[in-house]
Amino acid sequence: MMWATLVTLVSIVLLVVGRYRLIQNVSTFLVASFTLVTLINLFYLQALPEWRISWAELAEGLSFHIPEGKGLYVALAAFGIIGVGATELIQYPYWCLEKGYAKWTGPRDDSPEWEARAKGWIRVLRWDAWCSMIVYTFATLGFYLLGAAILGRTGLNPGGDQMIRTLGQMYVPVFGEAAEIIFLFGAFAVLYSTFFVATASHARVCADALRVFGVTSGDEKIYRWWVRMFCICLPLLFLASYAFFKAPEQLVFAGGFMGALILPMLGVAALYFRYRCCDARLAPSKLWDIGLWISVAGLFVAGGYAIYTKIV
């Protein structure tokens, strides 16, 4: 509890005084470091016959087989939080605004200069989306394969107070006695960066929600004040949940499950903006529209099935 309190207090200070660049640089360094260690671990694991992942096992994993029992619930929960989940899709525009991209594009008008700036910004978004997809797909595959190779074969189930220690077993075959230290660093990197960025993002969403619902005015100074207040209150709320709720993996699954339910709503919002709010000069091609509809359909399948399995 002492360490949790210390981390909370340090985070509050960093979040209150920090800006986009600090949050971006810290989180990028932490996550990239541990992801690289994990991929190196997976690579060297293939040299150990008892832990090597075969092509047959990969083919079985890619087969169209729906797991029974809690396996499907876990898969749907993971769908809601891995890669770019519901919360990231909601929070992404706030970081774009804080970075200043929208200010560079400027208010919409009929000039060809504005059209050129807007199209340039959309190209940046597309590159960002494609590069992000490549990065998080390979990173996610690395963690999935590592978990299947070690935890799946040994029957270890991370949960309760031993969750971090159990997950650390994935690094023992390659790193030996140093695995615990390496994973402690990695766990801190990933978990703290998630805590750090999520808190900063939720603070901005909550502060903006107060403006949307008319609780506060649209004044930028008032908005910034509320962002700082939420940067103080949210970490304290998280600390309280840690103190009184002793099953962290259940919170992770519950959050992922709710994220899977929110994804269809975001799909509808995307369709609304595409067909009701999009400037005709910036309309995407038919191929992009087809991709959008396929994505929305996939979000509805995942979200609908999540609701069905929970109710039935």
List where the protein language model places each region.
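Selective recognition of specific alpha-helical transmembrane segments in multi-pass small-molecule
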Residues: 84, 114-151
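Helix-loop-helix connectors at the membrane interface of multi-pass transporters/channels
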Residues: 1-2, 97-103, 109-110, 199-226
